[in-house]
């Protein structure tokens, strides 16, 4: 297939998991949310799925996709902004685990691997999505890559959570492009990093002025379910506890 052509999108349904392939990319969805033991249904049920807020000012788990771009060794090695590389890696792993638990589609992409310019996604992050394909690009702007764009559109989501390295390049470019197309975008400030604090901060300012919503990994994750008595909270809680313990190790 010509590298500029986009392969047809096809869906494969497997027991309790759904994989949606879009060209070279794979969108990963976790098993369906299980109702907690002892939970009941109907009026007065102690556990329920988290509904959208009336104003829809806060984001819900069922209306978002997670896009992760260029979490590669060369980029990690050059992070010089406020959130250090170890925490960027941990926060990204945390976001993936939350996404899998809440059935949020994930699009994972790299730049320059097939060209021999960069190495693949770091194992700690790739290992959170076993068996998934990764969309490799030549463009620093993922939004200009037809396979990446097809994968994003295949999610059917209009609210995007985006993380990338570096903040000022491979995050900023697709963020401002997505905003210009009418998507809502949340940038995860502590799951990204720049070549300097100045570059990182300037890029955050640019994206916010363009309409992006700045957030952090834990705050954004809890926003997606909000109610500790929701079914979503029962699967998210162990992940949050794991994250807080891991955070202590690198603090």
Over which residues does each language-model region extend?
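A short glycine-rich beta-strand->turn/loop micro-motif centered on a GG-aromatic cluster
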Residues: 161-164, 183-197
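Active-site acidic carboxylates
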Residues: 36-138, 154, 187, 201-208, ...
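Residue-level signal for short, function-critical loop segments
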Residues: 110-112, 166, 191
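Conserved, surface-exposed functional patches that form binding/active-site neighborhoods
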Residues: 173-183, 198-205
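Internal catalytic-core helix/loop-beta-alpha segment
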Residues: 137-176, 180
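N-terminal secretory signal peptides
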Residues: 1-14, 22-31
